[in-house]
Amino acid sequence: MKTAALLAVSWLCGAATVYSETDVEALAKKSQNPVEAMVSVPFQNNFNFGMGPDKEMGYNLNIQPVVPLSLSSNWNYIVRPILPILDIPLGGGRRKSGLGDLTLETFFTPSNAKSFIWGVGPMAIFPTATERELGNGQWDLGPAAVGVYMHGPWVLGALVTQGWSVAGESGRPGTAPFSVQPFINYNLPHGWAITTAPTYTADWRSDANDAWTLPVGGGISRTLLVGKQPLSLALVAYYNVDKPRYQADYQIRFSLTFMFPAK
């Protein structure tokens, strides 16, 4: 984890010689569009502080590739699996580590959209957690929708999902997970951007006092070329103004995204 933080600082502040390619600013905007027709592989490192009954640090790595599939000259199908790898404190010196539940978001989106891009499709959550404490033990299905507006230096929009349990492990309660992720990016020269993309979540079947997670915050991102490989890096921080009892008080996130634009 220390190595990841050092890489974040060194790459974000690295030598200007790797940023001279003329397409860096265009790639920056593409990296900010969750349904861009470009293969990308983000690695999202989340350092969560104040978790559990003893207010300890937890960590989760979200591996969330984006795979666009061309259906016709007018339509794309965007596939976005999200695989979490978790390490969480349980209190009393105990911890659990392993895979969490896999989320699959998919979107049908027009391929010829310009300044406004939208997409809708099905989403699913699979009970892939390797430990009981790392998942909900439910199979969830529901809709997903996204809208993106791009104008000048701005890339902004929101991604919304809603799931409902359709099956699950005996003895575990059903879930109805909802999430909305608004995102605002203001792009600066040389691939820099000011960014915020908090994810607000709720489970409509949870106790009302433990339903919502509401983070606020933001940070910076930079898109660059290392050799011929486009990368996007982001360093952001969020504070949870409302949250379930044992969720983190605040989070520091370092994201590294490998981009593979069509040639």
Residue ranges and their predicted role:
Residues 19-263:
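Transmembrane beta-barrel domains of Gram-negative outer membranes and organellar outer membranes
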Residues 4-15:
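Bacterial N-terminal signal peptides
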